[in-house]
Amino acid sequence: MDWSCYSTVIPYNYLLNPDGIILPYGSIIKNVENIEKLFGNKIFIKPNSPWKAFTGFSTSLDNLFYELNSITQLEKVNKSELTLISSHKQIDNTEFRFWCINEEIITYAPYTWQHNEVYSELPEDAIHFVYQILSYLYEYTDNGIVIDIVNTPNGLKLIELNALSTSGWYRGMDVDRLLKKLKEW
């Protein structure tokens, strides 16, 4: 689900990037001065779409041209690709993915982008937080949805929503339970 869609139904205090703006990928460099006025020198960029034209990343504005040029060459990103730009946020190294069907959490697993990282334990209020998110998504959850959350200095935050069919699986998830629910579904 596009950030521009779910950010309109999820309360802003639940979102990791509530301050985000949307720009076409090809317009980012032309808007560096405006981006700096809004967010300072360190920003986060990711595709608006869950189809992942590229992986989201944080960067300084000093490195922005290099980062975008690298992505353009490696990923062949279309200049019209809508892109979320927001301020950089401090987050835990461990993120949590929840696979949900019909407003029910089927399974979850931790994941991290850091090599040799020891996973954090699931925060005590994480399951309640995900059910709160699901309550705002009642129009969308009958299709199955994946919810990624992370702990921050300001509490749990929603990183993004994705489809079951476009999301990776991680060690620790209950694959058998998910497959059984998918078969019943």
Predicted segments — roles?
Residues A109-L158, R177-W185:
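A long amphipathic alpha-helix within ATP-dependent nucleotide-binding catalytic cores
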Residues N143, G168-M173:
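Acidic, proline/glycine-rich low-complexity IDRs
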Residues S49, K89-Q90, N151-P153, N162-S165:
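Short, flexible loop/turn elements at secondary-structure junctions
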Residues M1-L137:
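Active-site nucleotide/adenylate-binding loops and adjacent lid/helix of ATP-dependent enzymes
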Residues W99-C100, T107, G155-W169:
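A short beta-strand motif that forms the metal-chelation/ATP-contact edge
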